Swiss-Prot record:
This is Inactive glutathione hydrolase 2. Not cleaved by autocatalysis into a large and a small subunit resulting in loss of cell membrane localization and catalytic activity. The active site is at T381 (nucleophile). Pfam families: G_glu_transpept. Highly expressed in fetal and adult kidney and liver. Its main location: cytoplasm. PROSITE patterns: G_GLU_TRANSPEPTIDASE (PS00462). GO terms for biological process: glutathione catabolic process; leukotriene D4 biosynthetic process; peptide modification; regulation of immune system process; regulation of inflammatory response.
């Protein structure tokens, strides 16, 4: 009897320990790891709720493309100042099954009635209906889903429909832009109605509901992309743009098609290959920067001492300057022959020639780098990186251009439209440095403007993704993407440090190197000793998101400059 009681007692103790263990383990198992390393799949973007939507899409059996679309639909709500369905995007997609990369071009195009001298002032290209180009976002989602989707199209819209109806707290990024652009918003009745309460713009944490966009999303979920381009939404879209002075027609929407690019730009970095879009984006600029710099064989030792670090950053800035000088020759390859320009910008021989012109002791006047024209800045963007369980990946960047785009927001559909023509060159306007506008970037019907996007996927010789990276932040996108790659690949920084490390930017025109406030003073001093003009950035330079393959899984990092955390499982 005693023996029986002892055994029962021991069993009771074991049972209690098991229950306690489960109580301690289960909550922590449901949490995301503190170091943001995920064993199966990962996502990085600048809106946490949207990442959770993407992650849940993956868990439900969705592909990397499914997750990207579901998350981007959400980002279009939570960061409406940067992107949405009235804009356009590019996607770089890597299929782990086939081992092939591709690019989908769903950027806006000029309406058929557009012409080079259509703007009487630069302000006209920034605000109002005339600044609106034909949106491509939804056609891009459609093509990507047709090629790589697993879940039903309508399923991808459901979480965002619910979010738009129920509302969500205004995030850090949107709140900052609302405050900064308060005067502009006050002048636009529809924006005022959407983003203000009690005569004040919404602040961080206050609830924003978007019922009209919820209805629009529902229509797209049911009818597909056709609803936007020649279905039940089309007539209202045309009416809204034309009522604001625009020239987009039903024919423009009917004829819009996203473009599949089956052979994206690629360059070798050691035993890996980088895939990215070519011109009309800035993939060739990124390629030239990295090709120039890889000849220096950078390593962690390159930034160990103040002297080494100063020289290394000087070389990086000089590579930026040479690359941006050549950027002025890029344009839409359907309208401008950029074959030779892109061939040079991706040539290791050409990069070596430019490297030989870099002096370790001084920078040079602008003319030394031989810029021929200038290209305008681009603005508000959103980037997203995804790696799915099967190892497939998506790097996607969408942009409305300047914050809140054209400021034209439909009172019926809730769609906020782009102002994509601020990134086109205007023939009548020479910039403040005396450089003429680039003819390669003049407006023509059906043409797309040059942008700084560099949505990149790095793949090893084994066919496995090593890194997915991209950025948001206008012209600085290219240099910030380059720095994130340099920091991780050559300096050996982990992905979080690669994304957070202070950055600098130089686009040649103006002749200034912008540095973040917390950058190492040894870097600034070394640059000034070498005759660089430096200035402290008034705000963060750009925002980077990245995912890197590690021994422990997928390490994801979200730039704290804009707030949020990555997601995965």
């Amino acid at each position: 009897m005693k023996k029986k009681l002892v055994v029962l007692g021991l069993l009771a103790v074991v049972l209690v320990l098991v229950i306690v263990g489960l109580c301690l383990w289960l909550p922590s198992a449901s949490k995301e790891p503190d170091n943001h390393v995920y064993t199966r799949a990962a996502m990085a973007a600048d809106a946490k709720q949207c990442l959770e939507i993407g992650r849940d899409t993956l868990r439900d059996g969705g592909s990397a493309v499914d997750a990207a679309i579901a998350a981007l639909l959400c980002v279009g709500l939570m960061n409406a100042h940067s992107m949405g369905i009235g804009v356009g995007l590019f996607l770089t997609i890597y299929n782990s099954t086939t081992g092939k990369a591709e690019v989908i071009n769903a950027r806006e195009v000029a309406p058929r009635l557009a012409f080079a001298s259509m703007f009487n002032s630069s302000e006209q290209s920034q605000k109002g209906g005339l600044s609106v180009a034909v949106p491509g976002e939804i056609r891009g989602y459609e093509l990507a889903h047709q090629r790589h989707g697993r879940l039903p199209w309508a399923r991808l819209f459901q979480p965002s429909i619910q979010l738009a109806r129920q509302g969500f707290p205004v995030g850090k990024g949107l709140a900052a832009v609302l405050e900064n652009k308060r005067t502009v918003i006050e002048q636009q009745p529809v924006l005022w109605y959407v983003f203000c309460r009690d005569r004040k713009v919404l602040r961080e944490g206050e609830r924003l509901t978007l019922p009209r966009l919820a209805d629009t999303y529902e229509m797209l979920a049911i009818e597909g992309a056709q609803a936007f381009y020649n279905g039940s939404l089309m007539a209202q879209i045309v009416k809204d743009i034309q009522a604001a002075g625009g020239i987009v027609t039903a024919e423009d929407l009917n004829n819009y098609r996203a473009e599949l690019i089956e052979h994206p730009l690629n360059i070798s970095l050691g035993d890996a290959v980088l895939y990215m879009p070519s011109a009309r984006l800035s993939g060739p600029v990124l390629a030239l920067i990295l090709n120039i710099l890889k000849g220096y064989n950078f390593s962690r030792e390159s930034v160990e001492t103040p002297e080494q670090k100063g020289l290394t950053y000087h070389r990086i800035v000089e590579a930026f300057r040479f690359a941006y000088a050549k950027r002025t020759l890029l344009g839409d390859p359907k309208f401008v022959d950029v074959t030779e320009v892109v061939r040079n910008m991706t040539s290791e021989f050409f990069a070596a020639q430019l490297r030989s012109q870099i002096s370790d002791h001084t920078t040079h006047p602008i003319s030394y780098y031989k810029p021929e024209f200038y290209t305008p800045d681009d603005g508000g963007t959103a980037h997203l990186s995804v790696v799915a369980e099967d190892g497939s990946a998506v790097s996607a960047t969408s942009t409305i251009n300047l914050y809140f785009g054209s400021k034209v927001c439909s009172p019926v559909s809730g769609i906020l439209f782009n102002n994509e023509w601020t990134t086109s060159a205007l023939p009548a306007f020479t910039n403040e440095f005396g450089a003429p506008p680039s003819p390669a970037n003049f407006i023509q019907p059906g043409k797309q403007p040059l942008l700084s996007m560099c949505l990149t996927i790095m793949v090893g010789q084994d066919g496995q993704v090593r890194m997915v990276v991209g950025a948001a932040g206008g012209t600085q996108i290219t240099t910030d993407t380059a720095l994130a790659i340099i920091y991780n690949l050559w300096f050996g920084y982990d992905v979080k440090r690669a994304v957070e490390e202070p950055r600098l930017h130089n686009k040649l025109l103006p002749n200034v190197t912008t540095v973040e406030r917390n950058i190492d003073q040894a870097v600034t001093a070394a640059l000034e000793t070498r005759h660089h003009h430096t200035q402290i950035a008034s705000t963060f330079i750009a925002v980077v998101q990245a995912i890197v393959r590690t021994a422990g899984g997928w390490a994801a990092a979200l730039d704290s400059r804009k707030g949020g955390e990555p997601a995965g499982y």
